[in-house]
Structures are given as structure tokens and as C-alpha cells.
Amino acid sequence: MMNCIIARLALSLLLVTGCGLQTPLDQFASNPSDNPGTGGGGANTTWPQNVTVNTCEQYAAVNVGSYVVESDFWNQRSCPGTQCMAINDATGAFTVTQFPDCGNTVASYPNMLYGCSFGTCSPGSALPKPVSSITTVTSSWSFGVGGVATDQYDVAYDIWFCPNNTCGSNGFPNGTELMIWLNYQNVTGWESHLGTVSLDGHTWDVWVATQAVSGNNWNYLAYMIQGPMVTSVTNLDLTAFFKDAASRGYVQNSWYLYAIQAGDELRTGGLPYDSNSFSVSIK
């Protein structure tokens, strides 16, 4: 995420053994600190099943199968106010119903997490996984964004790589954060524009920057979709992005993939934001 880091969010997952790991997230209904992305404080919560959890907690984290759904209002200090969500704890569908006006500042990343990130781990995850052992990673995702033409947001995957297998459980990374922006408004990339690339049927603007938080540095690589924005992808080939990042020197074969997140970097407006269905397959 732009100048932000993670939370703990995700959804129900089915583990299938065999030649690879498949983690499809069940279809889910469409209704419902100061250190960025650390997911600061608060253990994952087990709620009564088959209920809608309404929460305005800064770092709400609800386990759903092998995923976690998180609020991750990581930059509340820069954007005082309240963020509220309605989460279906049986399916993982969620809606962000309230969020303050934060201007140009990324303040929150309500998302789904599979893997480990900043000390939060989804139950039963197969990550971290060596990049060298990955054949394919695909994902399907459906979401909805409301608001008006002046709102600012980006809906994106946030995918994390690290030279060792403990980054996600021990805090800040020192590898690469790879974002895939599927839908955004009144925002752009930052630092260095590397050009464009065609991947999985779309053209993407590629941006790179360096993140530095609490003495920890890592690469930030963003792929921003050109042309019409989308609100769903089906079997998006994430490995195509991994390979492109590797060709640019930002992912190493000896590193580990340790987290896949999908959410909305909230700034101003864009509500209601709904996450409707999500799945990941790793082989």
C-alpha cells in the first residue's frame, strides 16, 4: 500500500492437498498506533457464527476460515475519526460504511489477508512459501466502490516478498511490496515511473519507490491498470506480475512469498466499499 502497511484480513479458505495447494474462498454475500500497517494491537476475534459483526475498532480482525478480515485503520493519527465495517463472519463479505475525510493521505486498508503480515497470521495458511517452489498463483475477486467524482481511493492487491521466512510474523519487511491497482480515482503512482507493461490481458503503468519505516527499508512496486477500471477479476494470473517484478530485480528466486492481501486504500470517500467474493489458488 502507498506509505502504509498491513493489517490482518482475509476470508474462508478450503485447503486441497495434491499436486498443489488450492485456496478458494467461498462466495460471500454482498450485504453485509501509529506505525503504518503493523496492525497494532488486538488479537484476532472469534465471534458467534453466522452473524453480521458491526465494528468501529481501529484494528478489528475477524477470522473466517483460513483468512482474516481486518479494518486496519493504520494511519488514524493523521486522519482522526472513525471507520466502521459490517462483516459477515460466516462468509467474509464486508462493507465499509463509515470513514472520515483524509484528503490526499492514505489512512486505512480494510482488506483480506492470506498469510502472515506484521505479526498477524491467517489460520492454516500455506505461506510463507519459497518463490522457487511456486508454479502458479491466481486469484478471483469481486468488489464494489461508491462515492462521487471527487473521491480519492485505490482498490488493490498488496503482496509481500522477503529474503527470509519470518518477515510476516516478526514485523517490518526488507524485501518487496507489490501492489496491483484494479480501481482507483484521483490518485497516481509516486517516485519513479518505469513505463508500461502488458500482463494478463491489460496494460499497466509501473511505479517503484522505496519505503522506510522505523529504520526498515523495502521496495514498493505498483502496477496501475490503464483504461477502464474494473470491479472484478477472474483467475488473475498473479505469477505474471511476480515474474515481471523479478525481471526488474525486485523479487529474487530465493525469497519467500509470505502474504497476499486484497483491499481498499481509503483516503476520501469511495463509500460504501464492498468486498463481495474472493479466492486464491497457489500451486
Locations of regions flagged by a protein language model:
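Short helix-loop boundary/capping segments
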Residues: 165-237
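Bacterial N-terminal signal peptides
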Residues: 8-18
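Long, compositionally biased interface segments
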Residues: 218-283
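Ser/Thr-rich, Pro/Gly/Ala-heavy low-complexity intrinsically disordered linkers and tails
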Residues: 19-42
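Solvent-exposed N-terminal domain segments of exported/luminal and surface proteins
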Residues: 42-102
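N-terminal secretory signal peptides that target proteins for export/translocation
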Residues: 1-5
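Extracellular-facing segments of soluble proteins and assemblies that are Gly/Ser/Thr-biased and enriched
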Residues: 108-196
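Sequence contexts marking disulfide-bonded cysteines in secreted/extracellular proteins
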Residues: 18-20, 55-57, 78-85, 101-103, ...
